[in-house]
Each structure stands twice: as structure tokens, then as C-alpha cells.
């Protein structure tokens, strides 16, 4: 791998806006902490693997073959969070291929179920060290001077100041309540022991705004540790979340589940009262402990037997709009694992 260091923090969103085809995917730490102080802009996308229907060949098996053929060397410069590889989007509907016995219905959305894009180069901002690192795999070293030149001619971020007008629709309350009743029947019958029931929201813009405009407004309204702007040819993904699902570093995997939330208070006293309520509420504690058990079981499938430990238990993380209860579980991966089954 080849790299080049620049002092200072490059505006990755501005570079993405200037050249979205060359730099299509941004992962950003907007609310920074010791857990997350990097932002990454992926560069020069190569081949793409997509899954559009569950009846197509296994996405995970195909991706595993691509991953092994690429042979990305991740031993050099281990301190960096990305050293070449893939940008991957996995929709919930992929469970239909991982667990075909569930016979899940197809999604009505005109989106791919999963996408993997080969990425040989990236720009990484370390918000703690206040540096920017340009990296490229050895076979793609010619991209380094191009990225450097782009950074030296970086235009200012241009945003639409027009008011955002949105027609928002959501599933009816009756549909949600019917789902609750059906779940209770499943639990009573012993068919399930955990369900995540959600409601669909759909909005239609009444004014012209780019994906960059929407992302900028989201990160201002909800600054979070893990934000994403990914622009594909036919659709974009915009997200902002406090939760990291999985991290793998030096053969150790960890997950950091969140369960338990309270809004921030109107003043310091009210904020502290809400925080104490979150800490002591029996329902919140029971739900969080259940989630820890589920995550331990999930990690146990890929970790060495009996090695999964909770090294942080029911801590409070506070963000601009809310308090969260957070734990951290980790363990060493089994030998010989690859992304595939």
C-alpha cells in the first residue's frame, strides 16, 4: 500500500460534491469521540457486485470469491481504519438468502438488496491527530497524485439554502397495532422470542435538493458518530447513527449495542433527572441485558468457543438530542474465517 500524509483536516464532503463519480462514498464521524475519530472518503470505484432478487445466485458466496481473488494486503499500516478493500451495502432483505427457510416476502422498494463495490483508494481524516492520509493499494499507486491534486484544487462546499419542503407518509397506526397483536400470538405459540417491529416512512420532496444538501441538513440536525453519504448511479443512501454494529481489528471482533434512550433535558437539572431515570428503569435494564445476550450469541458463532466477553457494560453515552445506554462485547475470531459462509 502507498500513502501520503497531509497536515490538517480535508473537507471530504466538498470533495465528494465536486467529483461524486470519483469519490462516491463518504463515511463520516460528525460527533467525535475516542471510539470514532476517523472520516473516510472512498475513491476510484472498480467492479460492482449487486443482488436485485433473492432468486439470484448467493451474494455472500460471490462476494467471498471476489474478496479472496483481490487478495488485499491489510498488514501494512494497521493503524489506519481502511487499507483498500470494498464498500458494501447490505439490505435487511438479504436475510432471505441467508435464511431461506424463513420465506421472507420481497421488498416493494426499487433498490438492490445488496451491493459491493471494489475500492482500491481512499482519503482518511484523523480528527484527533488533525491529519489527512491519502492511501492506495500498490497496484493502484497512480491514483495517489490524482487525489492529492484534487485536494489542492478543492472548491468550497455549495449548498442549497432553499427551504426543504417534504410530503411525509407513514404506515397507518392500525397496521402497526395489528403487527403487535400478531407478534404476541407468535410469542405465545413459541415461534419467536424477539421481534423488531418497525414502521415505514416515505417522503417526497417538493423542492429541488441534492443528496449532499439532504446529508448536510441531517448531520446538522443529528450529529452522530457514524454518518454516511453513498451515491450510486440510481439511488443514494443518507444516514446518521450513534451505533456501531461490528468492528474487526487485528482478528478481534466487537459489537457495541444500544438499548435504552431518553431525550436530553430542557435544563441541567431536568437532563440529570432523565439520565437517572434511564439508568434505573427496570424495563430499560431488562431490554438491554436481553440484547447483550443476543449479541453474545451472534458473536459466538464466529469467535473462539467461550471467548466472548462484555468489556463495557451499560454505560451512558450522551449526544446532542438523546442519552443512550451502551455496552461493548468482543472476542477473537476463529481461524480461517472469510466474509462468505
What spans do the regions from the language model cover?
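Extended alpha-helical targeting/anchoring segments
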Residues: 1-341
Amino acid at each position: 500500500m502507498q500513502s501520503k500524509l497531509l497536515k490538517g483536516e480535508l473537507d471530504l464532503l466538498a470533495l465528494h460534491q465536486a467529483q461524486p463519480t470519483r469519490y462516491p462514498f463518504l463515511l463520516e464521524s460528525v460527533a467525535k469521540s475516542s471510539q470514532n475519530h476517523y472520516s473516510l472518503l472512498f475513491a476510484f470505484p472498480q467492479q460492482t457486485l449487486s443482488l436485485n432478487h433473492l432468486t439470484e445466485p448467493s451474494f455472500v458466496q460471490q462476494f467471498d470469491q471476489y474478496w479472496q481473488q483481490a487478495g488485499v494486503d491489510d498488514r501494512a499500516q494497521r493503524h489506519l481504519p481502511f487499507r483498500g478493500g470494498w464498500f458494501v451495502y447490505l439490505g435487511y432483505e438479504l436475510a432471505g438468502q441467508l435464511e431461506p427457510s424463513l420465506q421472507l416476502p420481497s421488498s416493494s422498494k426499487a433498490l438492490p438488496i445488496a451491493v459491493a463495490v471494489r475500492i482500491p483508494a481512499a482519503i482518511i481524516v484523523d480528527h484527533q491527530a488533525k491529519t489527512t492520509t491519502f492511501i492506495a493499494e500498490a497496484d493502484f499507486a497512480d491514483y495517489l497524485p490524482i487525489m492529492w491534486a484534487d485536494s489542492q484544487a478543492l472548491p468550497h462546499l455549495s449548498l442549497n439554502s432553499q427551504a426543504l419542503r417534504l410530503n411525509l407518509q407513514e404506515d397507518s397506526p392500525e397496521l402497526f397495532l395489528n403487527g403487535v397483536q400478531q407478534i404476541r400470538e407468535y410469542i405465545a405459540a413459541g415461534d419467536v422470542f424477539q421481534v423488531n417491529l418497525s414502521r415505514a416512512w416515505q417522503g417526497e420532496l417538493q423542492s429541488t435538493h441534492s443528496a449532499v444538501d439532504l446529508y448536510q441538513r441531517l448531520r446538522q440536525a443529528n450529529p452522530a458518530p457514524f454518518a454516511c453519504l453513498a451515491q450510486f448511479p440510481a439511488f443514494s443512501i443518507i444516514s446518521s447513527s450513534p451505533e456501531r454494529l461490528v468492528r474487526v481489528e487485528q482478528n478481534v471482533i466487537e459489537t457495541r449495542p444500544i438499548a435504552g434512550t431518553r431525550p436530553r433535558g430542557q435544563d441541567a437539572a431536568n437532563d440529570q433527572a432523565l439520565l437517572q431515570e434511564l439508568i434505573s428503569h427496570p424495563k430499560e435494564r431488562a431490554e438491554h441485558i436481553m440484547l447483550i445476550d443476543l449479541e453474545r450469541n451472534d458473536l459466538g458463532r464466529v469467535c473462539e468457543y467461550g471467548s466472548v466477553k462484555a468489556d463495557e457494560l451499560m454505560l451512558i453515552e450522551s449526544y446532542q438530542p438523546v442519552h443512550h445506554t451502551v455496552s461493548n462485547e468482543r472476542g477473537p475470531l476463529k481461524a480461517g474465517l472469510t466474509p462468505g459462509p
